[in-house]
A protein has these predicted regions:
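Conserved donor sugar-nucleotide recognition element shared by glycan-biosynthetic enzymes
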Residues: 47-50, 54, 105, 134, ...
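Carbohydrate-associated surface elements
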Residues: 102
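Hinge/lid segment of periplasmic solute-binding proteins
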Residues: 106-117
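Gly/Ser/Thr-rich active-site cleft segment
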Residues: 9-11, 121-237
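Residues that scaffold the ATP/ADP-binding catalytic core of kinase and kinase-like folds
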Residues: 96, 108, 165
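N-terminal glycine/serine-rich phosphate-binding loop of ATP-dependent small-molecule kinases
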Residues: 1-95, 123, 151, 206-207, ...
Length: 237
């Protein structure tokens, strides 16, 4: 029988579950972590906490299940939306992630509405500018932490940071990307109009995949650490 793993990078914990091909839970593990609140209305987390939680729980479910590594065929990712993860040229995290419930970006939302009418935002991204979404967070960092923005080479969502940790691939999938306010939702691709309007370089963003598409396989060092095979696939969502 073949098996699959699902990883949910949540706000309070990461949970990893091993299923058989009929959907029966074989083993599960979770690891909690905290939130940073530097000011009222701000909410951040350390991406390194997610990374450690994922690697630990992957190892745990593999060990607890006793399932041969070769029988585990794929990994699916889900997680908290809208969070901003910024990596430098060495793929190191630049600053804590500004997560979905952070409300500091009211000024950036107003700026976005001045740049483009509300109706056009809805036409392109299926939503008006919102404080919790990623685009406003990017603008906040550009304005208040220009030195961090200048160092940034990759912008990722939380589960896509985990994808990069596991596979080395910079990618996202349509359901999560739709919450960044940068996606042409109907076209299912990054909106060149939005990126130009906000002066965000397309090269900072990963490729967009459908949720069921294969985005990569495990890096050898990750496979060794978790007890999985390096040919284990990781899908978009």
């Amino acid at each position: 029988m073949n098996y699959l793993i699902g990883i949910d990078v949540g706000t309070s914990a990461t949970k990893t579950v091993l299923f058989d091909e009929e959907g029966t839970v074989i083993a599960s593990a979770s690891k909690e972590y905290g939130m940073i609140q530097p000011q009222n209305g701000w909410a951040e987390q350390n991406p390194g906490d997610w990374k450690n939680a994922v690697l630990e729980t992957l190892s745990e479910v593999r060990e607890r299940s006793g399932v041969p590594a070769g029988a585990i065929k794929g990994i699916g990712l889900s997680g908290q939306m809208h969070g901003l993860v910024m990596l430098d040229e060495d793929n190191e995290v630049i600053r804590p992630s500004i997560i979905w419930c952070d409300q500091r970006t009211g000024g950036q939302v107003e700026e976005m509405l001045q740049i483009m009418p509300r109706e056009r935002w809805i036409e392109l991204t299926a939503n008006p500018p919102l404080t919790g979404w990623t685009a406003a967070k990017i603008l906040w960092v550009k304005k208040h932490e220009p030195e961090n923005y200048q160092k940034c080479r990759h912008i990722l969502l939380p589960k896509d940071y985990i994808r990069q940790v596991l596979t080395g691939v910079f990618a996202t999938e349509v359901s999560d990307a739709s919450g960044m306010q940068l996606l042409d939702v109907q076209g299912r691709c990054w909106s060149e109009e939005v990126l130009r309007a906000l002066d965000i370089d397309r090269s900072l963003l990963g490729e967009v995949y459908e949720s069921c598409e294969i985005t990569g396989t495990l890096l050898p060092e990750i496979a060794e650490r978790t007890g999985l095979n390096a040919d284990t696939i990781v899908v978009g969502g």
